[in-house]
Structure formats: C-alpha cells, structure tokens
Design a protein with these regions (language model features):
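Short hydrophobic beta-strand element within catalytic cores of glycosyltransferases
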Residues: 48-51
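A charged, aromatic-enriched C-terminal amphipathic alpha-helix characteristic of glycosyltransferases
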Residues: 86-117
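A short helix/loop element that forms part of the nucleotide-sugar donor recognition site in Leloir-type
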Residues: 335-348
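Conserved donor-binding/catalytic core segment of Leloir-type glycosyltransferases
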Residues: 348-367, 373-376
C-alpha cells in the first residue's frame, strides 16, 4: 500500500483549511518561492512548516527555528519532519493569524500609500482578481480599503468577469491569446495587447486615482511601456508590489542562480521557459526597455519577503524606495478546524502522522511534487502518510 495520495487542485478555501488542520506537518519543496502563501495558511491553521530553503520560504515560519534545508536534501528534510512530530505548537495559529491577517497587510499598505498625506482613491492593477494568489491579495486590499472609507478600484486582465462596484476586467480574452502567440513567435512579451491597454488607460483616466498600486504585469494581458509612460506623464504616485523578479529581468519571473540581470540580460539560459519564446532571444532588448522605462522614475517597490528585497537591491532598481510587507490571508477561513470527516473520507489510518504539501500544479518541476514523493519513499517504513494537493 502506498503511503501517499495525490489529489487535484482546489479553489475551495474551506476545504484547504481542513487539509491544513488535518496535517501534523506542512512541507514545501518548490524550486523557488518569494513568499509562499501556502506556508502562511498552514500555520494559521496550527500546522508547523518545513521545507527547502529556496528564496523567501523560511521567512514565512513563525517558529524561530531553522526548519529549512538546502534544495534536494531529502535526508535533512526527513529529519526536520520527524523533529516536528516530537514537539507541540499550541500557539502557532494565534501568532500566525496576528502576523499574516489580511487586515495587518492592508494596514501596512495604507501606511505606505499615505506617506505625504492620506490617499482616498486607490486603483489596483493585477493579472487577476480573486482567482490566484495575487488576485486574492488585490481583492482583500480592495475590500479593506473600502471598509476604511476609501474609494478603491480593481483593474485586471484575465479571468472571469466580476460584477462588483469599481471592479473592471479590461483584458480582452481574444487579444490575450494573440499576445501569447506573438510572444512565442517574436520573443517579445509585454509588448502587445494594444486594445486592452487602451481600455485600461481609459479607465484610469475616468477613475482619476490618487495612487496606483500595481501588482503583476506579465501573463500576456497588457502592453507595459505605454501604460507606464501614461502613468509617468500624469505624475500619479505608484506603489508596485513585486511578487516575482519579472520587472528587473529580461523576462524571467524567477532568475534562480542566473545573475545576468545584475548587469545585462541576453543569451538567456531560460529562453524557452515561461514566458516562452520558440525561436528568438529578445531578453537583452526587453531588459533595456525596462531599465530605460523604470530606471529614473520615482516609485515605491514593495516585496513580500526580505529575500526578494535583497534581490531587487542587486538590480538596476537598487536605488528605489523598497518596503517589505508580508502577504496577508483571510484568517476567518484559515484557522484550526475539525477535519476528522476528511481523514475518514481520504481513508487515512487513524494512528498515522500526516505530512501535507499544497501547490498549484504540484507535480511540476518548479513546485517540487517529485521531492515530496521522494520524501514519502524515504519515510515509507515510518508511520507517516503524505497528502499532496494540487495535481492538474
């Protein structure tokens, strides 16, 4: 009998809270993460976290112990898991909920917005709304800003149409598909979506924000240069949250060990990775475009981790105002809950310790499901059961 089960991804946050509450240990084996929300969600449900020390993962840990090992160190990870089995973590949920609530996150963002005076009209831009990790953050900010008496709007490029006040999908799905195709053919990304970008600029003009808060601009839904040139020409203050490294590399969301971005991209070792080019390497041209566009512009960068802030400081954006604000989650959902029914449903032996891993597309190279299965194999003679959530 296998000591693991691989389950499909789910957007049901109540179900995810049950998974987290059921587990004795949560593990993350991603190749690179900036500030993984799953680790935060697990701890808010009372479950300690271990994993690979890749990027900002260990910054998520509430427990002041070194519970992260080098990438690929399965022996070390197994020892960390067993160590967690032997200890009690009674206050971990309370501490995590205080630090990582969406209310705490919003308060810190508002303090950043309000330098030089309170900003009443805030416009948030992201690839998504509600339907992704960044989309959830944007929607939480929108909700809490409105609760604070401000006027907030969301402009997003991809996903379902959402019928709420000042929530606007400017992206045209057909144009997004064309953008993705042209990017693969030409090697350029963030250079197309002419009509979608015009729609976004028109909305900004109409809304007349006191401040724009940008999140992700990759994923084939906006033409970056004319958007930023418009914002600069209008002299609108900007806070920009970097959830990845895309805006200071030629094209990569995660540069991993590559240091080309510290001087000049080109001859990209990841040219066929997302965002993919089939034939042409245009990373030098895209790097120069971003450097010229952003280099002399005054705006505030927010990163969710100190690790990512340190990476920004090695790029051409090193002299910008850089603030660290941890991602927040909905602690009304993510808190310890009774998951006994789920344990029965999954047919997990009652006396087993349970190790959980959750990630979108968890079996992909970047999310590290294969390492979790190697950990399960390593611990097959232990009374431990592994649950992996996030298979496509």
């Amino acid at each position: 009998m296998e000591n693991y089960i691989v389950l499909p991804k789910t957007a049901d946050q109540t179900l995810l809270a049950k998974y987290y509450s059921l587990a004795d240990v949560f593990t993350i084996c991603s190749k690179r993460e900036n500030f993984p929300t799953t680790c935060v969600e697990a701890q808010c449900c009372g479950t300690p976290v271990v994993g690979f020390d890749t990027g900002g993962t260990k910054e998520t840990s509430i427990v002041p112990q070194d519970d992260f090992v080098c990438y690929g160190d399965i022996d070390g990870l197994a020892e960390k898991v067993k160590d967690k089995f032997c200890k009690s973590f009674k206050n971990i949920a309370e501490k995590a909920q205080k630090e990582y609530s969406k209310e705490t996150m919003t308060k810190r963002y508002m303090e950043t917005y309000d330098r030089g005076g309170r900003k009443e009209r805030i416009l948030l831009i992201d690839v998504n709304c509600k339907g992704s990790s960044t989309g959830k953050i944007v929607y939480d900010l929108y909700t809490n800003l409105r609760a604070d008496g401000r006027t907030a709007a969301i402009c997003y490029g991809r996903g379902e149409n959402i019928e709420e006040e000042n929530v606007y999908k400017f992206g045209l799905d057909w144009e997004t598909n064309i953008h993705a195709g042209l990017s693969r053919i030409t090697g350029y990304n963030g250079y197309f979506s002419y009509f979608s970008t015009k729609r976004l600029i028109k909305y900004i003009e109409k809304f007349n924000p006191d401040l724009i808060h940008i999140h992700e601009l990759h994923a084939y839904f906006v033409n970056i240069k004319p958007l930023i040139e418009y914002i600069k020409a209008k002299n609108i203050p900007v806070v920009w949250t970097f959830h990845c490294e895309y805006m200071y590399t030629g094209k990569c969301g995660h540069a991993y060990e590559c240091k080309n971005y510290q001087h000049e991209c080109g001859d990209c070792p990841a040219v066929k990775g997302y965002p993919k080019s089939l034939w042409f390497d245009k990373t030098r041209q895209m790097f120069e475009m971003k450097k010229n566009l952003l280099g002399n512009w005054k705006f505030t960068i927010v990163t969710p981790s100190h690790w990512l802030a340190d990476r920004v400081k090695t790029s051409f954006l090193k002299n910008k105002d850089i603030v660290v604000i941890h991602n927040g989650i909905d602690t009304n959902v993510f808190h310890p809950v009774d998951a006994s029914d789920l344990k029965k449903e999954l047919k997990i032996p009652g006396d087993c310790k349970l190790v959980l891993a959750v990630a979108p597309n968890i079996m992909s190279e970047s999310k590290g499901g294969k390492w979790v299965l190697k950990l399960a194999e390593k611990m097959k003679n232990e009374n431990v059961f592994f649950v992996l959530v996030g298979a496509l």
